[in-house]
Regions:
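Ser/Thr-rich, Pro/Gly/Ala-heavy low-complexity intrinsically disordered linkers and tails
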Residues: 3-10, 14-141
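N-terminal catalytic cores of secreted or lumenal carbohydrate-active enzymes
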Residues: 150-321, 344, 348
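A short, flexible beta-alpha/helix-coil linker loop
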Residues: 191-194, 328-333
């Protein structure tokens, strides 16, 4: 593993990194800014220190059974700030609008705040002076322990014991710190909402909670969306097909209002602080010559305006874009960009256009997927001082893992698309027979592969991780006739929601992670990974690829825990620091 100089102890979200000591005029404020935190301290939070006094209990709160809002009588152990609602008794993590409240937490539910803490911040985990988390001294319910194995997913009844003798098989070293990790997310696509539309309203709500709820779901914080069609739209389209409309007079997101925006708003109903980012798969055909992006100034200027209008029109719908990646896979068949052209577009057209129109969405150099072509684009952009005036991060996926370390020295790096195919390829590519029902689209082996991929990318140095499709039907066929996987699937004929093994692989990583958790070392196995949360708690993830359950002892600080990790399964342990 490696460290990113200057990032530990800082707050990061997409391209914005602000250390706790830096005053900022960006959203903050004592529980009232867009991301909570101490007044005037940092872009996404306040000064470091999760246990300092202040309103909002990150590990306190009342002991009632209400998961959102309101106080509830509990036992009277000291502490527990005024959290935004009581968490469910005995639950180890922050629920939406609630602190981590256990049966022994004192205090009462208090003022609103989407993720706990005093005030009205959209995503304010803090009401006091904690970085992305509030103060509070109440007793928590840690440790927590969850396992998953084939046909036995998200088991919270496993045995976790504290032991005093023997040599631990795994040791967490919280002093060996690496990059901050801002969170997980997935992509909104039309086909996902179309699949969900066959379900009852209750099941649609269940799906959104499984993905975005911070207490009873995967705790996703980020959402990707296409700018125009993706290969998982219902059909190919762009947002301005009027030939020669360089002024974007006919630009429209009317199509997005049919499926895409309702999908996003259903998720926002569960988690109002979702951070949205976008990239185009296609551009208006009049901007292309064949499959190549035209390179004249008028066209490139119009394309920059096209992206600016996208951000502005979404804002009118109450949807804020935090980042734009200029192209999904620049070498992909729909739109080809040369290396020089892509970089010039950012520094000469897109960056200045966003600046002129006061657009706050960050520009990422992404999404890059093909080595060496896309690797070379990203590396060249990182070395271009004029481009880096506008580039706030990099988006990489598929086989660009080896490029992460070098890019991370320049700016934050996101893994932007989890490996998604069900691998049943045939020729020609549009042949539906490439999908084989004899090989499950989302089987447990794919879940195991997913866990390892997430681990490998994080160890490589990424600061965030995105799934591809969050929801598809059970066939999962793209417009390019390539069947792909999703975290949740819908059986259209049975009108049934199915939770896949890959979903649980993601949730093992994501549920207990707080924004800006720090990757730390685990000694004893490469199949274990750990994070230090801003509130001081530690999340350890373990994978057992063996054919039998693995007896494991884990040392965290001065405490050693003993438990079993199931065969071909995962375990998550949430402990005090």
């Amino acid at each position: 593993m490696r460290s990113i100089p200057g990032t530990v102890g800082c707050v990061l979200a997409l391209g914005l990194v602000a250390c706790a000591s830096e005053p900022s005029s960006n959203p903050g404020g004592a529980g009232s800014g867009a991301h909570g935190g101490a007044s005037g301290t940092g872009t996404l939070g306040g000064t470091a220190g999760m246990t300092s006094a202040g309103a909002g209990g990150a590990l306190g709160g009342s002991a009632g059974s209400s998961s959102v809002g309101g106080s509830s009588a509990g036992t009277t152990s000291p502490g527990g700030g005024a959290g935004a609602g009581a968490g469910s008794a005995g639950q180890p993590t922050a629920g939406t609008g609630g602190s981590t409240a256990g049966s022994s937490g004192g205090g009462s539910g208090g003022a609103a705040g989407a993720m706990g803490g005093a005030g009205s911040g959209n995503a304010g985990m803090a009401g006091g002076s904690g970085t992305m988390g509030g103060a509070g001294t109440g007793t928590s319910t840690l440790p927590a322990f969850v396992t998953s194995a084939a046909n036995d997913y998200w088991n919270t009844t496993g045995k976790l014991e504290m032991v005093t003798a023997g040599t631990p098989t795994l040791t967490v070293d919280a002093t060996a710190k690496h990059q901050p990790f801002v969170g997980f997310g997935g992509c909104f696509n039309e086909m996902g909402w179309d699949a969900l539309s066959v379900l009852s309203a209750d099941d649609v709500s269940k799906a959104m909670k499984l993905l975005f709820d911070a207490k009873d779901g995967a705790n996703f914080l980020y959402g990707r969306l296409p700018m125009g069609a993706s290969d998982y739209s219902m059909s190919w389209y762009t947002l301005d097909d009027t030939v020669g409309d360089y002024a974007m007079d006919d630009f429209s997101i009317a199509r997005d209002k049919e499926k895409l925006i309702p999908y996003i708003k259903a998720a926002l109903a569960v988690r109002p602080d979702i951070k949205l980012w976008a990239s185009p798969w296609v551009v208006p055909s009049w901007m292309q010559s064949g499959s190549n992006m035209k390179n004249d100034a008028q066209t490139l200027g119009a394309h920059a305006l096209y992206m600016a209008r996208f951000v502005e029109e979404y804002a009118k719908e109450g949807l804020t874009l935090v980042a734009i990646h200029p192209q999904n896979e620049p070498g992909y068949a729909r739109v080809h960009w040369t290396q020089a052209q892509f970089i010039d577009f950012i520094k000469t057209y897109l960056g200045p256009t966003f600046a002129e129109r006061n657009i706050k969405a960050e520009i990422y150099c992404g999404t890059m997927s093909k080595d060496p072509d896309d690797t070379n684009i990203a590396k060249a952009a990182a070395m271009d001082a004029d481009a880096m005036k506008y580039i706030k991060g990099f988006g990489v996926q598929w086989n660009l893992q080896a490029a992460v370390a070098g890019l991370a020295a320049k700016a934050p790096v996101w893994q932007t698309e989890h490996k998604c195919g069900n691998y049943n390829f045939s020729t020609p590519y549009w042949d539906q027979s490439r999908y084989s029902s004899s090989k499950p689209q989302n089987d447990h082996l794919y879940g195991e592969e997913s866990w390892q991929l997430i681990r490998d990318w994080i160890v490589a140095g990424v600061n965030g991780y995105s799934a591809w499709n969050m929801v598809l039907d059970t066939i999962g066929m793209s417009l390019d006739r390539w069947p792909q996987n999703a975290l949740l699937t819908v059986d259209r004929s049975a009108k049934k929601l199915i939770v896949t093994p890959a979903y649980y692989a993601f949730r093992h990583f994501s549920q207990y992670l707080q924004p800006n958790a720090i990757l730390i070392d685990v000694k004893g196995s490469t199949d274990a990974i750990a994070f230090l949360n801003p509130d001081g708690s530690i999340v350890t993830e373990i994978y057992n690829k063996g054919a039998a359950a693995s007896a494991t002892t884990l040392q965290v600080g001065s405490t050693t825990y003993q438990f079993d990790v199931p065969s071909h399964g995962w375990a998550t342990v949430l402990t005090p620091g």
